[in-house]
Amino acid sequence: MTEIPAKQITDNDILKDVYKSQNKQFSIDAIDILDLEELKDVQRRKRTEFEGYLKRNRLDVKQWMRYAVFEIEQHDMRRARSIFERALRVHISYVPLWIRYIESELKLGYINHARNILERAITKLPRVDKLWYKYLIVEESLAHFDIVRNLFQKWCSLEPAAHVWDSFTDFEVRQERYEDVRNIYSKYVLIHPQFSTWRKWINFEVRYGSTKTVRSVYSLALDALIAYSESRNELVDDCINLIVEFSKWEALQKEYIRSKSLLEIAIQKWPKSNTLNNALLQFEREHGTAETLENTIILNRKKHYEDILNEKVYDYDTWLLYLQLLENNYPKLVMEAFSNVLNAAIPTSRTKDKYWKQYILIWIKYLTFLELTINDIPLCGQKFEELIHNIIPNDDFTFSKIWILYAEFEIRQDNLEKARSILGRSLGLCPKRKTFKYYIDLETKLREFDRVRILYENFLKFDPLNLDTWRAYVEFEDSLGDEVRVRSVCMIPIQNNIGLFSKSFQLHLLEILIDYEMEYQNFDNIEPLLKKQVELSNFTVEAWTDYAMKKLTVPTEEQVQNFQIMKEERLKDSSALDEQEIEFEFEITDNNKDNARDVFERALNYFKEIKRDEDRARILQSYVDFEGQYGDISSRQRIEKRLPSIVNGIKDIDGLKTQNITYTFPDDENKSNIDTSNILALAHKWKESQEAKSR
């Protein structure tokens, strides 16, 4: 038989047992009592049990309370009082014991006994609010209002918490003794001088007092809090909140001058207070004119910006907003503000980060202000020099925009040579693409083409791998109609004598040169360029295909001659016709197609020789596509017959099986068949000659 496993005891079971044993109470068995002697016997036994338990554990206050309740149930109040007194000697600070003692006396109607116990309780435990409130509730329920008042006065002499004073004032309000309430508040604010206390007094006066008393309390509160705030900074916010409320109250009384004056005087004392500034702004919105409202808003914004800048001197966004505000509303302060930011907020980093960019933006705003707003040209030029030589660390980085703005400034002053000198200095100290482009554009507009060529040459020395610069240089020479220089500029990277340029870079310029040669109608120069293009492309299928398609668009010598004859005839017929207006046009003939086919054949031979079967198959497919577009059905079918058959196999290399694709070209098989036929024919001819000799 299989044994039934015993139930496992978990930690939760152990904790439950401990909890039950701790909460197990001393129980009293229910006994049926038939006569007085049995009652006395039961009482004696129960008292013995209680006494025995308390001897063992005299600190169990709840058991003392059960003992006292038992005696009360036996209608023996004398014994119950004795037990309560014994318990108090053990735990005099246990408040529930006092409360149970007091409530027991009250339930049985022993008011004087309860009052005596309450007196003892508040004397022994004067800081326990519950005992005081119990005493007050008892006396007020008995309508002993004088005793209640005396108790409150006695309690308040101990300088208790704010809720005690609030209870005292609420009691006097219920008795409608408003002067006594004012006397209480006059002492209350001395003990708790914070704004919340004064607000309670003010609310009382608003409800039960007059305008005069409300204003008087506001004034007292303001004087007191300001005096306290001199030594206690935490009361400053209370003062400000009180002033705002005082101002609102005065506005409700339609005393607008008083209301605004309060805020303005307070702002003079605490100019950085957002609460006061917002309150003044709100006052102007509700009671001011459009002009005063706008002035207040602007003033608040100005103070707000100044507060931020005092803490964050490198907050350039705020500086820009602040300067814009001053320009529009306080023009006399603008120069001082510019001086402050430009001298105090110079970035400390030696890298061109966002702080430098924002700082330079402020300089640009300053220089624009000097030139256009106050028209101080000498000072503007002086500040440009200061910025360039003393502020910007040109050894580490520079700002092309500043050099360009300086040059434009001198151009506006008709100092062209100085502008050139400035741009030249910029390129000498710290050359930048933006500066080169601007200088080139300037000289181009001035039609100083020799200077432009020099600048382009220096630009390419500075940044020779910038394709856009080479393209721009070529376009510039093309705009002047100088074919030789266009070709020379393009050939520098293409020839790549110093090995600086990558093949992709050379291919880009080669494309540009081919397009220009086509435009100039120098068709004889295109063939070597196309071959060079294929070579630089590592003889890829795409390069050969592109070569063939471009070869298709290159006219033959006959087509060029026909075009020249046609052009001469048209020029004779129309004297007003310009030679450049006649575009070169020709139809694609079989000769053009044969030229393209020749390229495809060369590509096939090339891939066959180097045994690149996959590329050979791809160029054949391109050849088929070409014939499909430009050839006829027979030419297309002829090329399609040359397409290879593909056989997929598996090759074992060092134990690893990989897929192997084999291409079989019909061209190769035909050649093999031709070679075999020739050998057989020769053998047959040799045999016949031998037979003839033997005869």
Curated annotation (Swiss-Prot):
SMART domains: HAT. It comes from the Eukaryota. GO terms for molecular function: chromatin binding; DNA replication origin binding. Pfam families: HAT_Syf1_CNRKL1_N (PF23233). Belongs to the crooked-neck family. Involved in pre-mRNA splicing and cell cycle progression. Required for the spliceosome assembly and initiation of the DNA replication. Associated with the spliceosome. This is Pre-mRNA-splicing factor CLF1. It comes from Candida glabrata (strain ATCC 2001 / BCRC 20586 / JCM 3761 / NBRC 0622 / NRRL Y-65 / CBS 138) (Yeast).
